[in-house]
């Protein structure tokens, strides 16, 4: 029987595990070469036991929760299978560094390279230290829509990047030869390896201090405690079957063809089952994700609803959760489905799970949120030396849904991306031929309600040199819904401005291989969150604050909230407002009539005229 430490020592071990993953994270931030790692923080680090169970995941990208543990387990199986079949000694040893970017293991795209170091104590394999991080380039097409995984870049199977402490030069040379900016790739590679090695050293130091038995017993106790907390929260949800449906705009290939998102949640005592069987089949465009991502979005929703503040995130967090996800769904795609923009659809699955459970636990869910990274992929040649530059020029925050008792958060990264950050304006302008003209809140974008949805943002980026522009923005048509009478938030938008005046909005958020010339600008507008509760019940003092801060306009205050102003002032006439609110209960103004209109929609003729310049530039650039 496993011997467990006393509660005090268990808490010391708990905090030791959290400290290890936080130090791994800090180490990677300070040594990585790519801005998407050291600024945007598109990575996650973690510790796993000898069977691949999650021990501690660093605060980072929640969507990597399942992918990392699944990858570690598959690595264990892989080397066991090879050793058994070939009857040779090719197992896992001290000094090994394992690596893969297999999209169908991680559930994400090929840019996510995962490095894993085995941890040994007294000659036995006891744990793993791992890091999954986004490389800016992994080969493959730069622009346009990919139709299969083979066009998206290098696929690295499970191999050893280091064998018993010695570098595998074949692997390292292969990477250098096949990426566009090898010095950056090798810098990020070495940063990840340093981070996972540090995690292994710190874990061994924890064992040296408290003993292997105490550390393993402490980990088991932590998992059991986390499980008990989660089960307690599930028991508080009324038993039943809860369903909800939403959609994605399209897959980027069949324009305008909606992609169904349907979830069924079953609660029975202290167990929850999330069934994604009726989610749409995998699609032609690159918006598919693997099974690990489909299950991760269920885990993200479950963690939010049961134990959002419990640290570290570990295997016990999800023991009360069953997930039904057949292969071949858009979030359980199989080879060779393209997966470059893997992260987009799972965000709406999380939203839809909350929507399904809203009737059962209205006090624990939020309305719909903007649910997209609003990322633009840019590439061009530097005017001064002709060198290629690449940038994911987005990661802007939007509005989160309101909840019972609180307005939604504004300018916040979407739920599945957790601790990722937007890159500082100063860094972007210093490193790339871009000028950020504006990055601010979007007035009137939050859905009206007793509690108002968070505001989206607007980012205007002017070209200081020619470059190619690609946007992969979703939820333009599927707006963040409100709950219990709350209005929807505004949708996401993508626009361009050619010259100083003319701005036109794309009818879709999916814009591929469009050339912008010096002086042109692209504009990303993140949607606002949905409101919660009827707008006519919003306290007038909150509306006054919103007006003062510029969050809403007079038009929104009058139309959605039934406000009457005194004369030509911004002072609210309280008595007149109460009378008007009573009248509006029976004849409310439709929310769509009050949406902000930032720009005209681009016609097909407009687009043809604006983007006839790209062919010669493509030849120069790529």
Regions found by a protein language model. Name each.
Residues 1-121, 125-622:
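Glycine/proline-enriched, intrinsically flexible loops and inter-domain linkers
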């Amino acid at each position: 029987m496993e011997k467990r430490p006393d509660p005090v020592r268990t808490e010391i071990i708990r905090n030791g595990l959290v400290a290890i993953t936080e130090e791994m994270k800090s180490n990677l931030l300070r040594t990585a070469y790519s801005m998407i790692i050291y600024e945007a923080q598109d990575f996650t680090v973690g510790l796993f036991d000898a069977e691949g169970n999650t021990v501690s995941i660093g605060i980072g990208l929640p969507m990597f929760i399942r992918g990392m543990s699944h990858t570690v387990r598959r690595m264990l199986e892989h080397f066991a299978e090879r050793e058994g079949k070939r009857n040779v000694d090719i197992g896992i040893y001290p000094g090994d560094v394992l690596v893969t970017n297999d999209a169908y293991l991680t559930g994400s795209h090929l840019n996510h390279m995962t490095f894993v170091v085995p941890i040994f104590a007294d000659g036995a394999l006891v744990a793993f230290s791992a890091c999954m991080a986004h490389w800016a380039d992994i080969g493959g097409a730069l622009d346009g829509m990919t139709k299969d995984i083979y066009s998206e870049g290098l696929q690295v199977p499970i191999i050893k990047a280091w064998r018993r402490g010695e570098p595998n030069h074949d692997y390292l040379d292969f990477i250098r030869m096949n990426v566009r900016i090898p010095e950056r790739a090798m810098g990020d590679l070495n940063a990840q390896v340093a981070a996972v090695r540090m995690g292994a050293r710190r874990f061994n130091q924890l064992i040296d201090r408290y003993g292997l038995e105490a550390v393993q017993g402490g980990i088991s106790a932590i998992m059991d405690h986390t499980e008990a907390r989660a089960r307690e929260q599930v028991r508080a949800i009324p038993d039943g079957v809860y369903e909800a449906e939403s959609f994605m705009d399209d897959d980027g290939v069949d324009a305008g063809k909606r992609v169904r998102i349907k979830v069924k949640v079953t609660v029975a005592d202290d167990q929850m089952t999330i069934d994604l069987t009726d989610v749409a089949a995998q699609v032609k465009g690159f918006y598919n994700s693997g099974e690990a991502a489909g299950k991760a979005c269920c885990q993200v929703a479950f963690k939010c609803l049961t134990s959002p503040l419990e640290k570290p995130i570990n295997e016990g967090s999800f023991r009360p959760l069953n997930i039904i996800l057949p292969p071949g769904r858009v979030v359980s795609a199989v080879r060779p489905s393209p997966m470059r923009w893997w992260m987009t659809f799972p965000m709406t699955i999380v939203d839809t799970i909350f929507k399904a459970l809203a009737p059962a636990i209205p006090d624990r869910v939020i309305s719909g949120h903007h649910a997209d990274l609003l990322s633009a992929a840019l590439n061009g040649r530097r005017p001064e030396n002709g060198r290629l530059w690449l940038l994911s020029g987005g990661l802007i925050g939007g509005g989160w849904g309101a909840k019972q008792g609180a307005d939604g958060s504004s300018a916040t990264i979407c739920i599945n991306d957790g601790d990722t950050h937007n890159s500082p304006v100063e860094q972007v302008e210093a490193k790339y031929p871009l000028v950020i003209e504006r990055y601010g809140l979007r007035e009137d974008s939050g859905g009206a309600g007793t509690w108002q949805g968070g505001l989206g943002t607007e980012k205007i980026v002017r070209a200081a040199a020619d470059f190619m522009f690609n946007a992969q923005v979703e939820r333009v048509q599927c707006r963040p819904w409100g709950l219990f009478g709350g209005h929807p938030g505004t949708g996401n938008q993508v626009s361009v401005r050619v010259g100083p005046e003319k701005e036109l909005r794309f009818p879709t958020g999916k814009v591929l291989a469009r050339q912008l010339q010096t002086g042109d600008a692209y504009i990303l507008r993140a949607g606002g969150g949905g409101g919660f509760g009827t707008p006519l019940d919003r306290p007038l003092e909150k509306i006054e604050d919103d007006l003062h801060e510029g969050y809403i306009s007079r038009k929104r205050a009058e139309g959605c909230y039934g406000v009457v102003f005194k004369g030509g002032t911004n002072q609210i006439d309280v008595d007149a407002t109460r009378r008007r609110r009573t009248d509006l209960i029976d004849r409310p103004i439709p929310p769509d009539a009050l949406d902000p209109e930032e720009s005209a929609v681009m016609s097909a003729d407009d687009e043809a005229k604006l983007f006839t310049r790209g062919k010669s530039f493509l030849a120069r650039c790529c």
